[in-house]
Amino acid sequence: MRKVSTGFVYFFGALGGLLFGYDTGVISGAILFIQKQMNLGSWQQGWVVSAVLLGAILGAAIIGPSSDRFGRRKLLLLSAIIFFVGALGSAFSPEFWTLIISRIILGMAVGAASALIPTYLAELAPSDKRGTVSSLFQLMVMTGILLAYITNYSFSGFYTGWRWMLGFAAIPAALLFLGGLILPESPRFLVKSGHLDEARHVLDTMNKHDQVAVNKEINDIQESAKIVSGGWSELFGKMVRPSLIIGIGLAIFQQVMGCNTVLYYAPTIFTDVGFGVSAALLAHIGIGIFNVIVTAIAVAIMDKIDRKKIVNIGAVGMGISLFVMSIGMKFSGGSQTAAIISVIALTVYIAFFSATWGPVMWVMIGEVFPLNIRGLGNSFASVINWTANMIVSLTFPSLLDFFGTGSLFIGYGILCFASIWFVQKKVFETRNRSLEDIEATLRAKTGEDAAELSTTK
């Protein structure tokens, strides 16, 4: 490991999140111009938007088993290359099908980043800082979305502006690759693959030369590493079942509470309550800025409040905001007061999501799976998250036509409150606990210990 600061490691380790956010957010503005220049029908527009989601499902599915075998850092470098190729391929696409293929390739990198980075950051960070460090991923995602909104607005006056919008992502992709050349490998992976001295060196840097902490962590990792790498049978086995339920549940609830539909369709919502198109786009940028600020605050407090308490507070705030917003939208026609109430409620909803469910879901799926299948487990949870994202995004326009904006958001609000039951019943607390302690608790609960599992394939 080259001599680099912990800040450098955390920044470049999380940088893939910026590409994740940018590449999922930029299409909301670019599609307006792509549709006109390529003369796309409704189903073709839907495919341009959804191709990244399809690629993300594939990328997340592939990356988990691969990262357990080849390491987190190598796969992060590969993701950067795929980001770069996908961005330039999208920008230079001459026709519809080339664009779709490029967007699927890009989506594979997005899915890989979502499955890989939370695990990588969780395995690098000391237990007392893991929540803060892991939530940097979500901060980068929100920063990427904001950058996409600004880029969309900046190039909206150019005929070929959409090519610049899509191609701009190649710049941070190149930076991620260059930074990744210097990043260390995950110490957990290094111990598991027999590189003990290198793992100790990485932990020494990340723990700021606290030898007591380093020795304890090395011993704990070695104990977990005795267990042979597991596969799909262990992922669905008795011991991992509590982790799997948490991962799947958090991944689904984060999407079905309406977060991405609100973010993707915010300009449409603004125009529905009386904003002009230009004002709606500027308001979208304003929401993006607010989003980043709130997420930054969440990063600062992530290790000071229990994870379960954070998401439950978020669910209550989001649910109430959606109820208020739906009522405001029902009466927004011709009523400036109702329109203002709807916009305020929308902003409050996004604030609660950005401070709670946005970062905490990614933090926790990087924590709850045992070392020997952590990559596979995180990958599976990410696949579920992207699948739920795709289903919600594809069904939103039809549900909107059928129920209307107000009634639909009441439904999302009910799901917010349903998530509280799930968190209270199924989720265990992980704050200020080492990854090995979390794993030991799982094994104790299910009656399986390291000695038993180290002899099973």
Swiss-Prot record:
InterPro entries: MFS_dom, MFS_sugar_transport-like, MFS_Sugar_Transporter, MFS_trans_sf, Sugar/inositol_transpt, Sugar_transporter_CS, XylE-like
Regulation: Transport is inhibited by 6-deoxy-D-glucose.
GO molecular function, one term: symporter activity
Subcellular locations according to the entry: Cell membrane
Pfam families linked to this entry: Sugar_tr
Keyword Phosphoprotein appears in the UniProt entry: no
Keywords linked to the UniProt accession: Cell membrane, Membrane, Sugar transport, Symport, Transmembrane, Transmembrane helix, Transport
GO cellular component, one term: plasma membrane
Any one GO BP annotation for this protein: D-glucose transmembrane transport
SUPFAM superfamilies: MFS general substrate transporter (SSF103473)
Transmembrane keyword on record: yes
Topology versus the membrane: Multi-pass membrane protein
Residues that, per the record, bind beta-D-xylose: Q138, Q254, Q255, N260, W362, N385
Highest taxon, organism lineage: Bacteria
Induction: By D-xylose.
Residue ranges of the TM segments: 14-34, 46-66, 81-101, 104-124, 131-151, 164-184, 244-264, 281-301, 309-329, 338-358, 380-400, 402-422
Functional note: Uptake of D-xylose across the boundary membrane with the concomitant transport of protons into the cell (symport system). Transport is driven by the proton motive force generated by either malolactic fermentation or by the metabolism of D-glucose.
Family the entry assigns: Belongs to the major facilitator superfamily. Sugar transporter (TC 2.A.1.1) family.
PANTHER family recorded: D-XYLOSE-PROTON SYMPORTER-LIKE 2 (PTHR48023:SF4)
Protein name: D-xylose transporter
Organism name: Levilactobacillus brevis
Phylogenetic placement of the source organism: Bacteria, Bacillati, Bacillota, Bacilli, Lactobacillales
Gene behind the chain: xylT
